[in-house]
Regions:
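FIC/Doc superfamily catalytic core
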Residues: 1-315
Length: 315
């Protein structure tokens, strides 16, 4: 989920990395502008909220989309751009002025056209294959551009939500924004081709390639993480009485690979002193499973380096 948020936001120009986001979540200081990390964090919250709403049997409607937009724009640069409200003004895509635009979405007074997309997403008048539905809904949302800002990220967020809602995925494990970012120019060209020439076929082929490549990469990463857990559990066996606590902490690091002592207390129930001793041991030269990021004696933050390296792999 965090990886999708980071990549989708990078498509829009933010500089936050996955490590920056996780450091921010531990109240550390990321190495990029705070607004960038706040925007990515808001995206994570919006995607989490969307999955929660779908699990609560909410349909994907105007109401939910507005709620998710508000959640995604609640802090950072977007806070002044009408969070959760459809735009009242004309916008354009590309260029500094409307006469330089690559594409001009419908006027604000025609946003009722969104109703047709809402019906399509909810299989009215007839159902559509989930992958095709996600692909077409993304383009249509981007074309309508219903908000003043944040349309790109929210349009990409629609894809995993539709796949979860249709039971193709149990959780938003497909990070299509990784593929879209790597092939950003083609991504934009395929969207534009649909708007100008109605070339849906090329867009669908591109989208299917994205799904296939992303799924393959996700399986590869999952296999590497499974192997990593096995290898590192074995490394803990010689730790004697510390092994059980270290094993609990390792499990927690698979959930939060950048973490502080307080978070580990919350995740494991172990005493702070015990956690401190284990983290000190895991950072020693014969193991080096974690590294301390702050250089401070208090409020230390630790990174599970190998896990992060695997998660950061690109295509």
């Amino acid at each position: 989920m965090r990886k999708e948020a980071v990549m989708s936001s990078q498509i829009e120009g933010t500089q936050s990395s996955l490590s920056d986001l996780m450091l921010f979540e531990m109240e550390g200081m990321p190495g990029v502008p705070m607004d960038d990390v706040q925007e990515v964090s808001c995206y994570v919250n919006a995607l989490s909220l969307g999955v929660q709403r779908i699990q609560e049997s909410y349909p994907i409607t105007f109401r939910l989309i507005k709620e998710l937009h508000k959640s995604s724009m609640i802090s950072g640069r977007g806070i002044s751009r009408g969070p959760g409200e459809f735009r009242q003004n004309q916008v354009w895509i590309g260029g500094h002025r409307a006469d330089e635009a690559a594409f001009i979405p419908p006027p604000a007074n025609e946003l009722a056209d969104w109703a047709a997309l809402e019906k399509f997403i909810n299989d009215v008048p007839e159902p559509t294959d989930p992958l095709i539905k996600a692909a077409l809904a993304h383009v249509q949302f981007e074309t309508i551009h219903p908000f003043m800002d944040g349309n790109g990220r929210l349009g990409r967020l629609l894809i995993p939500l539709i796949l979860v809602e249709t039971k193709v995925l149990s959780q938003p494990f497909l990070y299509l924004s990784v593929f879209f970012k790597k092939h950003r120019q083609i991504y934009y060209e395929r969207l534009q081709q649909v708007r100008i020439t109605s070339d849906w076929e090329e867009w669908l082929l591109f989208f299917v390639d994205a799904v296939a490549a992303t799924a393959t990469q996700a399986v590869n990463i999952a296999q590497q993480l499974y192997q990593l857990r096995r290898e590192h559990k074995k490394l803990l066996q010689p730790l004697g009485r510390m092994e059980n606590s270290a094993s609990q902490i390792l499990d927690a690091l698979f959930e939060h690979p950048i973490v502080n002592i307080n978070k580990l207390v919350q995740l494991t129930g172990l005493a702070p002193a015990t956690i401190g001793k284990v983290m000190e041991r895991l950072s020693q030269a014969d193991l080096v499973l974690v590294s301390e990021l702050t250089g401070q004696k208090r409020n230390r933050v630790y990174a599970y380096n190998r896990y992060i390296e695997i998660l950061n792999q690109d295509f």
